Regions:
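Catalytic cores of enzymes
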Residues: 1-242
Length: 242
């Protein structure tokens, strides 16, 4: 006999989740380039994400996920556990039904986790997935996965995707070019569609302005300083003439 059930009531799978070194290195590198913030390992908690994620241009989540085919609202992203919380086994899970009630306003949400875009039909709602939840919560576009993706290959593609976005490419073209570049250098079985075709873009495809904007008052302050310097120089010249 073979018994299959969703691991909602039992969270022992958390102990078997593999580290994601390629995703960690990626987020550290590009958070510096784009002047962002990152949280990894024990700092990547569910509560911190909910408090920090709103109103950013890009939200990037590199973690494990579970798609629940029986109850799609119970599909979840898995964050770091709180060591001190021994009673609430589920405190590190962010479920689809919770995401619908969170402000996740952003130009782009990147969900490099297994099956975040895998949909399940629910009467009256259509196709439900974690990506659908992020879109409802305010993310204008979502880069997501349709199946269990290889962490190393997806990190390479997302890196190329970021590079293309920084060049001003539309998001769909940035992803297409990233996949083509990946295929050109992939060797052996890693060139198979299983390793690169699972990442798809949903939603708005417009480019993202990733250049840091300087507030207007910085220009005003610089102008005032320049004016003061000019006045001081004029005053010095008058003093020398007298």
């Amino acid at each position: 006999q073979l018994g299959i059930k969703d691991s909602v009531k039992l969270d022992k799978t958390y102990l078997t989740l593999l580290p994601q070194p390629f995703s960690e290195e990626l987020v550290k590198q590009y958070s510096k380039i784009f002047n962002g913030r990152y949280f990894v390992n024990e700092n990547a908690s569910k509560d911190l994400f909910i408090n920090q994620a709103k109103e950013h241009k890009i939200i990037h989540i590199g973690t494990h996920a579970e798609s629940n085919n029986l109850s799609p609202e119970l599909s979840r992203l898995i964050f770091a556990k709180k060591v001190e919380d021994k009673e609430n086994y589920d405190e590190n899970s962010l479920y689809s039904y919770e995401i619908y009630n969170i402000d996740l306003s952003s130009n782009l949400a990147i969900l490099t986790a297994c099956e975040t875009g895998k949909p399940t039909y629910q009467a009256g709602e259509g196709m439900i997935s974690l990506a659908h939840a992020f879109n409802y919560a305010g993310s204008e576009s979502i880069l997501t996965s349709l199946w269990e993706i290889d962490e190393e290959s997806s990190a390479k593609i997302v890196k190329l995707f970021y590079d293309n976005l920084s060049k001003g490419m539309p998001k769909d073209e940035a992803l297409r070019q990233a996949k083509l570049s990946y295929i050109e250098t992939a060797e052996g079985r890693t060139a198979a569609p299983q390793y690169w075709a699972g990442l798809v873009l949903i939603g708005d495809t417009a480019p993202i302005d990733l250049k840091a904007r300087v507030a207007w008052w910085w220009y005003l302050a610089a102008g005032i300083v320049a004016l003061i310097l000019v006045l001081l120089l004029i005053g010095n010249k008058k003093g020398e003439t007298n």
